[in-house]
Amino acid sequence: SYDSRTAQLRIERDCAGVQHTGGSFPAFSLFFAEGTEDEVFDAWFAALGCRPRTTRRLAGYSSWYNRYQNIDEASIQEDLNGCKTLFRAGDLFQIDDGWERKVGDWLEPDPAKFPNGLRPLADAAHESGFLAGLWLAPFVCEKESLLCKNHPDWLLQVDGQPWCCGCNWSSFYALDIDHPEVQAYLKQVFDSVLQDWGFDLVKLDFLYGAAPFGNARESRAGRMQRAMALLRSWCGDKLILGCGVPVMPAFGIVDYCRIGCDVGLDWDDVWYMRLFHRERVSTRQSIGNTIFRRQLNGRAYGSDPDVFFLREENCKLTLQQKQTLARVNAMFSGIL
């Protein structure tokens, strides 16, 4: 952090609890460079040995920002039919949260919503010329899920209690990525989604749940990077859009990565939410994230600034605000 009042730069590394057997070790490495913005960031990523997995720019559709969890087979098919009039071959058609029974129960879609499963919808997207994408949150499960009820030993424990990551859904808990049965389950999940159901891209959310803290063997950042490497090993060459993940542990591992907060259906949410934190749901904050993290795009991965809106219904953004959001996203992103 930089304190402009005192002209002091403070650098910290989160390695609380990590134990070393003795001898010397590097606390962290520093990189100093001068030049234009492009020269400096190109040199830094070269020193890191980091290159993006793809330079392909994606555009497409997500079910989340209009239907949210209120999706079913008919509504997804309706949206797919609409996308045929807007998008080009090779664009992305992505089904978001709401297809599963409960977060954590990934092996079968909700039969009440998707009685024919998801394979027919992935096939329909392919027949329309689109890539098929699907949302999951692999490192967490909600309290009411069958996974949580049947496998409490799979949950990451702190002082004998499961670690609660947040209050979404029925509240949700972190999975222990060191548990061999957790790893086997998640491999089975990705085999099903990517091979059996035929999806080309997975949007993986709430990834921070893998590493809420470090331990005696590894720092929090090291654990997060190891979790990301596990995801890549399970997904092979399929496309990954990472979400809810610290930006650096995802460098060079995911194809695309969210680099900021969610946009909202209005400019800056209600007043009391502005007292919360910077990464809250906010179109205004999202635009700032996209601008000030622009250097990651095309160097670490394709940056995902979140969506922009074309519709007029169910959206309180003015035309100027929608245009500003779309222009900033178009300038500094790898996925639209």
Whereabouts are the PLM-identified features?
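Aromatic-lined carbohydrate-recognition surfaces of secreted/lumenal glycan-active proteins
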Residues: 63-65, 94, 130-143, 224-257
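Short glycine/threonine-rich loop-to-helix capping motif typified by GTGT followed
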Residues: 214-221, 254-255
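Generic alpha-helical structural element
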Residues: 65-72, 220, 316-320
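Glycan-recognition surfaces
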Residues: 148-184, 188, 229-336
